[in-house]
Amino acid sequence: TKVQSGSGYHLDDYLAFVLKFHNNLFDKATMDENANYLETSADTIDDNLESVSINSGREAVSFGNMEVKQETKPRITLQEMNNTYTVIRVNTILSTEISDGVIQYYDLSETYKLRYTADRMYLLDYERTMDAYYNESIIDSANNLISLGIQNEKNISYIYSDKGYRVCFAVEGQLWYYDYQSSDMYKIYSLASENISDIRNATGNHGIKLLSMDDKGNIFYLVYGYINRGRHEGMNGIQVMKYDAKTNCNEEISFLSTSLPYDSMKEDLEKFSYLNSKSVFYCILEGDLHEIDLEKKKDKILESGLVNESLTASKDQSIIAIEKEQNLYKNKQIEMIDLESGKKQNFTTGSDKRIRAVGFLSNDFIYGEANAVNVSKSSNGTVSFPITKIH
């Protein structure tokens, strides 16, 4: 949250425009007003409803032939505001009847980039995503087909085992498990309540990351971000979870509390998080490198005080290199750790030299060496590191 003092931002005008544009989406008669702001490209595809932009056609922007209605009031978030433009996000949950008595729910997220002038409002950019909550009533077990409906592929994750006879997938804050042999579908975990229109479902600042699945269907996974229900409701952090397929029960292995916002947690987990073959999980949270033994349920901090770019990982993230000095321009030691074998290797240099990680070529570590007198840090924090030798 950022508190900003000022005047002349025309926030009331921005909000009025956004709400009017948003409400016009659900009324074909008023959609003409919205169409005037679109910049439809010649090659637009009007049946692409999962991802819509200012370059999309009128049909796609107004949901094509779908008859949708809002299940929740629009939830408005002010993302950016200055004297030049303002960015506003709108989230809501929609529904449509896909067959007699079968209701499908969707999470809708819109982003508006606007500029105000005394003459008119300019829509500089518009992006919208639409993702379906999984509906188990439309599974085609006879053909072993699971339809996820309207989805953005980047928001779907899945793992499978037992030659594909067991599959687990995460979509819209829900974790589902399907056993092909028994044709059974289970909702393992859900950040959304059974009442989809519950306002807590529309926060959008939490996620699920799948770690592993064995041939018995047991699953390790993470729930991270703002926890909106359960015993950690209202807290921010990472839950390390285990699902037992035999008992159909979830168990919390560990909970790592943090003040980091969801976007930062997601970025850190995408940058580095690794589960080795011995069910030991590694991740970085607020500068601490955690080693969590999922079987023994033990959490150990291997390193503290890590700063941006002080950890470098191989492509498969099984090997990491850590610069031991927080101040890069003072660093004289790098420790490399193989997270599968646990083996460590140290690289050092003389007192008149400095070293820093360059990266990995496959699993081969590369680092650079520079003369200490030539390494400097500017007033804006940028480090100049003229490498004289590559190792």
Residue ranges and their predicted role:
Residues 1-65, 141-184, 191-193, 197-206, ...:
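Core segments of small alpha/beta cavity-forming domains
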Residues 56-102, 206-215:
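Surface-exposed, charged secondary-structure patches
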Residues 84-127, 133:
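Exposed beta-sheet edge and beta->alpha loop/turn motif
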Residues 105-111, 206, 331, 353-354:
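Short, surface-exposed coil-to-beta transition loops
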Residues 106-108, 169-170, 233-237, 382-387:
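Short coil-to-beta strand junction motifs in C2/discoidin
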Residues 113, 177-179, 240-242, 291-293, ...:
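Conserved blade-register residue in beta-propeller folds
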Residues 185, 249-253, 297-300, 342-344:
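Predominantly a core beta-strand signature of beta-propeller blades
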Residues 327-338, 343-379, 383-391:
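Extended, charge-rich low-complexity regions and/or helical-solenoid scaffolds
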